[in-house]
UniProtKB/Swiss-Prot annotation:
Coiled coil: none annotated. Gene3D superfamilies: Ribonucleotide Reductase, subunit A. It comes from the Bacteria. The gene is mmoY. InterPro entries: Ferritin-like_SF (IPR009078), MethMoxA_beta (IPR054956), MP_mOase_hydro (IPR012078), Phenol_Hydrox (IPR003430), RNR-like (IPR012348). The keyword Amino-acid biosynthesis does not apply. This is Methane monooxygenase component A beta chain. M.capsulatus has two forms of methane monooxygenase, a soluble and a membrane-bound type. The soluble type consists of four components (A to D): protein A, comprising three chains, in an alpha-2, beta-2, gamma-2 configuration, is a nonheme iron protein containing an unusual mu-hydroxo bridge structure at its active site and interacts with both oxygen and methane. One of its GO terms (biological process) is one-carbon metabolic process. Its EC number is 1.14.13.25. SUPFAM superfamilies: Ferritin-like.
């Protein structure tokens, strides 16, 4: 029987192993022993990020772009391999082509987080010592920041968990590292929201830092009802790890997350004397921009422009966009109900409409247009405004 007809592969088959050993040349085929010579650099020279990340994860020979050969010597019960192409609908000639534009790996990522915390600590010390909390409107502080901004941490926590499958099933190390960091940044945002609430509890007598009230709003309230359903779907109901990662960042968070963070809390906070919440939101927006660059490289530059599967991948991503756009619009429509709880005169329909157009236009330019998804900005805004009371 020919080697192609054998069911067993590589080292699991002694006969095939003997054939392989016999075919090995006596002298090395390649005498280059420079570190990482087998990695194709994205930039002018091989970066530290690439040298320590690319091809660190072993791969079977059916994972496109890898350097290994043969099958796994160990498998899950039932014969499932450690990684398999069946975990995603997207296809490519090279799963190892993606690069994080910011070249993040473990050490610089941890360093960045440490620097952010030190800066946050200094800011909070100055804020407290200066008594700036006295300028914040108590209703805004106790109702909108405590309850509704606090409830948003569960949105970010759910999106963090939506990355768990991709962090396990990703078919290459470069993809896995990016997915993991996108997820960690989401849980970091959730922690920053609770940090703000904990800080307020220290400087405002009677302010409750417990998550009981925000959790009740997230699980039982009307403002986040459709958002909760969307997050639960992205986290628990998607088999394809690329679908969940793509839909979180290229659809849901780019629309709903951006509106909540930037166009509601960050835009309105100064009107209530709140310069504390925008400090944390600016960090969250930095994470959003970092993830956007990585998402665009992975899904548009690599998979969307794949030399063999570009048309197919774009079709799949357009289908995912259409699938998750409706739940996202529903989440925004429900969130419109929060404007009715604001004091009269805080904002008006004209400003809210302009905010929606900013978010939708950014989404179309940065995401939808990159895969030729036809989106009607006016129709989206109209559908969302139907929830404005």
């Amino acid at each position: 029987m020919s080697m192609l007809g054998e069911r067993r592969r590589g080292l699991t088959d002694p006969e095939m192993a003997a054939v392989i050993l016999k075919a090995l040349p006596e002298a090395p085929l390649d005498g280059n022993n420079k570190m990482g010579y087998f990695v194709t650099p994205r930039w002018k020279r091989l970066t530290e990020y690439e040298a320590l990340t690319v091809y660190a994860q072993p791969n079977a020979d059916w994972i496109a772009g890898g350097l290994d050969w043969g099958d796994w010597t160990q498998k899950f019960h039932g014969g499932r391999p450690s990684w398999g192409n069946e975990t995603t609908e997207l296809r490519t000639v090279d799963w190892f082509k993606h690069r994080d534009p910011l070249r993040r790996w473990h050490a610089p990522y941890v360093k960045d987080k440490a620097e952010e915390w030190r800066y946050t600590d200094r800011f909070l010390q100055g804020y407290s010592a200066d008594g700036q909390i006295r300028a914040m409107n108590p209703t805004w502080r106790d109702e909108f920041i405590n309850r509704y901004w606090g409830a948003f941490l569960f949105n970010e926590y759910g999106l963090f968990n939506a990355h768990s499958q991709g962090a396990r099933e990703a078919l290459s190390d470069v993809t896995r590292v990016s997915l993991a960091f996108w997820g960690f940044d989401k849980i970091d945002i959730a922690q920053m929201i609770q940090l703000e609430r904990g800080f307020l509890a220290k400087i405002v007598p009677g302010f409750d830092e417990s998550t009981a009230v925000p959790k009740a709003e997230w699980t039982n309230g009307e403002v986040y009802k459709s958002a909760r359903l969307a997050v639960e779907g992205l986290w628990q109901e998607v088999f394809d790890w690329n679908e969940s990662a793509f839909s979180v960042h290229a659809v849901y968070d780019a629309l709903f997350g951006q509106f909540v963070r930037r166009e509601f809390f960050q835009r309105l906070a100064p009107r209530f004397g709140d310069n504390l919440t925008p400090f944390f939101i600016n960090q969250a927006q930095t994470y959003f921009q970092i993830a956007k660059q990585g998402v665009q490289d992975l899904y548009y530059n690599c998979l969307g422009d794949d030399p063999e599967f570009s048309d197919y991948n774009r079709t799949v991503m357009r289908n995912w966009t259409g699938k998750w756009l409706e739940p996202t619009i529903a989440a925004l429509r429900d969130f419109m109900g929060l404007f009715a709880k604001l004091p009269a005169g805080t904002t008006d329909k004209e400003e809210i409409t302009a905010s929606l157009y900013r978010v939708v236009d950014d989404w179309i330019e940065d995401y939808a247009s990159r895969i030729d998804f036809k989106a009607d900005r006016d129709q989206i805004v109209k559908a969302v405004l139907a929830g404005l009371k």
